[in-house]
């Protein structure tokens, strides 16, 4: 591997601003804010608006589009469905 071409990868705490859920992960993103993790160490804190704790796909609150296909929409629009 070449030296000095790879980004600095370090551990950070991601915090969901909607639920307060926090998890420790690796990232190249930097932050001026810091927080203490469960192991007693201090890590940079990155706040995110959506995480697996609040995203509808992961929470089971996702709604699927039940409008039908293009043909059904056309038939409904022009009253061709019988």
From Swiss-Prot:
GO BP of this protein: translation
Entry keywords, A to Z: Ribonucleoprotein, Ribosomal protein
Highest taxon in the source lineage: Bacteria
Any one Gene Ontology cellular component term annotated for this protein: ribosome
InterPro entries: Ribosomal_bL28/bL31-like_sf (IPR034704), Ribosomal_bL31 (IPR002150), Ribosomal_bL31_B (IPR027493), Ribosomal_bL31_sf (IPR042105)
Gene3D superfamilies: Ribosomal protein L31 (4.10.830.30)
Position of the signal peptide: none
Keyword field contains Magnesium: no
Family label: Belongs to the bacterial ribosomal protein bL31 family. Type B subfamily.
Subunit structure: Part of the 50S ribosomal subunit.
NCBIfam families: L31, PRK01678.1
Record HAMAP family: Ribosomal_bL31_2 (MF_00502)
Name of the protein: Large ribosomal subunit protein bL31B
